């Protein structure tokens, strides 16, 4: 199926991505004491599952560029989405003198500790790729809302993303779909799974004589090896398997799943869709090892970074009683031509220049939200003069 690039409509979005605790290098020295902030530079901490895998390294690249443009020091902690490491990372970054922290947590429960740590240390906090569920985690959501230091969350519409991806497979004729998750209970994973199931249920209702099945998930963690083993298990369990959805986890599980399908000699028999663009996605769309993918959202943490930066500067204030919910769009590609357009403005170059990053840092909260919502291939091309 040939699809043009498009964004998820994000107007009514509601819900919902290991190196121990060593700080990975970013802008500045990454020192572990509070002396760094005495230099006069703003210091922002980044708690991330990995700053070195496919998606994490893209996030780090745009954050480092923003830090350079704004003369900000950044310190990274890779926490592998292990709950105790997620909560400890916030404590570590606060102790290191960070005035603000952006975090990609694994589950809502971790945010209880993260919010308390930031309240106690008077450190501003914003989420990226995540949002606390007002419905499923009402107490934690209220704690975030009550906090004078929790700003809000930048996140994607994961159920819509999941439904879009499974529809790519269904429209290609796939009916036996294997599912690979990464961490049980991860809010983003649960949102995508909801979308996959909704897409299959809708298809089956409309096509009672041509029904599709979606397997129970195999869990891969966030490693390539995990993705490979999960794909092998699904292929062994269903000889008629004709599609796989490695749901996410930073890109490494997807690479492992692709390798397993290639080893089995089933590249032409099993279509694969996923989230988080691979660096060689164009080639994989060309050779058939990928059928489609959502991604291009590595600027999501950039918006969280700008929120925290402005809070530290005093430009954004009075957070108590508020929860800034910032929807961020996905891009979808399902052909080599789709990817070429993405590659030109998001891979060969960053979608924002240093001058544009400085201008972004001066936006009001509402204008920053609008900037996030409109990011697309067309938007990047227009700003590049094309």
Residue ranges with predicted function:
Residues 2-4, 17, 24-386:
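A residue-level marker of the well-folded mature domains of exported/periplasmic proteins
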């Amino acid at each position: 199926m040939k699809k043009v690039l498009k964004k998820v409509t994000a107007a009514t979005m509601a819900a919902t991505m290991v190196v121990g605790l060593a700080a990975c290098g970013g802008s500045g020295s990454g020192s572990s004491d509070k002396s760094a902030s005495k230099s006069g530079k703003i210091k922002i901490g980044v708690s991330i599952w990995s700053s070195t895998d496919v998606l994490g390294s893209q996030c780090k690249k745009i954050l480092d560029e923003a830090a350079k443009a704004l003369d900000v020091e950044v310190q990274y902690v890779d926490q592998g989405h292990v709950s105790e490491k997620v909560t400890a990372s916030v404590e570590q970054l606060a102790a290191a003198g960070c005035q603000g922290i952006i975090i990609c947590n694994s589950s809502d429960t971790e945010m209880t500790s993260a919010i308390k740590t930031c309240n106690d240390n008077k450190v501003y906090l914003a989420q990226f790729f995540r949002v606390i569920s007002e419905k499923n985690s009402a107490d934690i959501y209220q704690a975030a809302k009550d906090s004078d230091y929790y700003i809000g969350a930048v996140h994607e519409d994961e159920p819509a993303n999941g439904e879009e991806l499974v529809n790519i497979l269904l429209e290609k004729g796939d009916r036996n779909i294997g599912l690979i998750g990464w961490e049980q209970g991860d809010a983003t994973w649960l949102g995508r799974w909801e979308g996959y199931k909704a897409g299959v249920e809708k298809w089956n209702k409309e096509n009672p004589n041509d029904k599709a099945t979606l397997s129970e998930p195999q869990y891969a963690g966030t490693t390539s090896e995990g993705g490979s083993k999960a794909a092998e298990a699904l292929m062994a369990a269903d000889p008629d398997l004709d599609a796989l959805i490695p749901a996410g986890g930073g890109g490494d599980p997807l690479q492992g799943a692709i390798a397993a399908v290639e080893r089995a000699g089933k590249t032409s028999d099993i279509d694969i869709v996923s989230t988080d663009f691979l660096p060689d996605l164009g080639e994989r769309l060309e050779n058939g090892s990928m059928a489609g993918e959502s991604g291009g959202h590595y600027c999501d943490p950039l918006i969280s970074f700008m929120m925290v930066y402005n809070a530290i500067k005093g430009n954004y204030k009075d957070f108590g009683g508020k929860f800034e919910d910032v929807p961020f769009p996905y891009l979808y590609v399902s052909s080599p031509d789709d990817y070429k357009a993405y590659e030109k403005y998001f891979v060969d170059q960053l979608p924002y220049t240093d001058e544009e990053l400085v201008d972004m840092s001066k936006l009001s909260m509402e204008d920053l939200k609008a900037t996030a919502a409109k990011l697309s291939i067309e938007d990047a091309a227009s700003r590049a003069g094309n």
